[in-house]
Amino acid sequence: MIKNPKLLTKSFLRSFAILGGVGLVIHIAIYLTFPFYYIQLEGEKFNESARVFTEYLKTKTSDEIPSLLQSYSKSLTISAHLKRDIVDKRLPLVHDLDIKDGKLSNYIVMLDMSVSTADGKQVTVQFVHGVDVYKEAKNILLLYLPYTFLVTIAFSFVFSYFYTKRLLNPLFYISEVTSKMQDLDDNIRFDESRKDEVGEVGKQINGMYEHLLKVIHELESRNEQIVKLQNQKVSFVRGASHELKTPLASLRIILENMQHNIGDYKDHPKYIAKSINKIDQMSHLLEEVLESSKFQEWTECRETLTVKPVLVDILSRYQELAHSIGVTIENQLTDATRVVMSLRALDKVLTNLISNAIKYSDKNGRVIISEQDGYLSIKNTCAPLSDQELEHLFDIFYHSQIVTDKDESSGLGLYIVNNILESYQMDYSFLPYEHGMEFKISL
């Protein structure tokens, strides 16, 4: 998962430089300090060898010691001799050594050691290390350090490569996922099954991303509703203009004919009454237009309401109308029927539906309000509407044939009901049943 070679190369070189630098410093430190440690170690070995040999000489006679010292000096890099044999600080033995009192330089000199021989004599043996230990230590280092340094460099290279990949792969993974999140992909998420730090961070980012998507979807939904409302307003204004234009044109014709006393229009009282009726129709239409423009305000709040008390109040308003038509109203709702919407919106929906159910029921018909399987049901006995009428029934200012025959309704009622229910995202249907029509609203 290498998405950024430059970053990988840069991080690799940084890690390699650090490890290689540390390795170099360590090797330099070893080169500078090891000779002193080696001198100390050789000194301890030298002391131990001299002590052991001195103990061995105690078992020999004074005549045997010179030959033993000579053999000892030949087999080792240590010169051993009797101190009495030193003449002008030079020894005609195995080694010619320039010994400086009190200063060893590159040599290690053992102090005189007294030996009691087997024949009871007391002799002093002097041991001298005849090798440049400091130089020998450096030679040893120069023999091995180049190889160990190459091994260190190789290890640093391999370790830096795999360490950098292991370090950066989670970052590349985070970068890849967050880049897809920038495109608002609903299906992209961090793998929360990871047990490392990325898994923990991923859980937090997933939570934030899900909340962000939720907010964005809500905003998109609201924007769609706003666009829809704007389109509805345009259609509404056009429809309202058309609905007002027709009665105004009719009223103008009546008044002009009355002005010129043409035909029956000479009967002014009769046509003044008709003109007033036209004006009342336009006034009623304007009231409905103003009311329908407020449905957005009605749907801004939500509360849980019991439907029955609101319905009882509405039925009391239409009791006289129902009685005049001979329509029987059956309210089968209980106090358990509840809905989430504003009181004004609920009142407007039920008022329009109950009003239509009563107006367009058969003479001596029935209106039944009940709750069925989570739906509020309003049935009325009437002639079922055709499929063509049902298709356009919720369009603004639409008039079905039944409506036109019975009333001069504007057609705004069901349009308002449709908009309110859609604003609350409530499912609804208006379909024929065996005795008439049924309007159902999901609760």
Swiss-Prot record:
CDD domains: HAMP, HATPase, HisKA. The chain crosses the membrane at residues 16-36, 140-160. SUPFAM superfamilies: ATPase domain of HSP90 chaperone/DNA topoisomerase II/histidine kinase, HAMP domain-like, Homodimeric domain of signal transducing histidine kinase. The gene is hk06. Its EC number is 2.7.13.3. Disruption phenotype: Expression of CbpA up-regulated at transcript and protein levels. However, another study shows that expression of CbpA is unaffected at protein level. Does not significantly alter nasopharyngeal colonization in mouse CD-1 strain intranasal infection model. However, significantly reduces numbers of bacteria found in the lung and blood at 96 h post-infection. PROSITE patterns: HAMP, HIS_KIN. Its main location: membrane. It catalyses: ATP + protein L-histidine = ADP + protein N-phospho-L-histidine. Residues 165-217 form the HAMP domain. Member of the two-component regulatory system HK06/RR06 involved in regulation of target genes, including choline-binding protein CbpA. Has been shown in one study to not be required for regulation of expression of choline-binding protein CbpA. This is Sensor histidine protein kinase HK06. It is a multi-pass membrane protein.
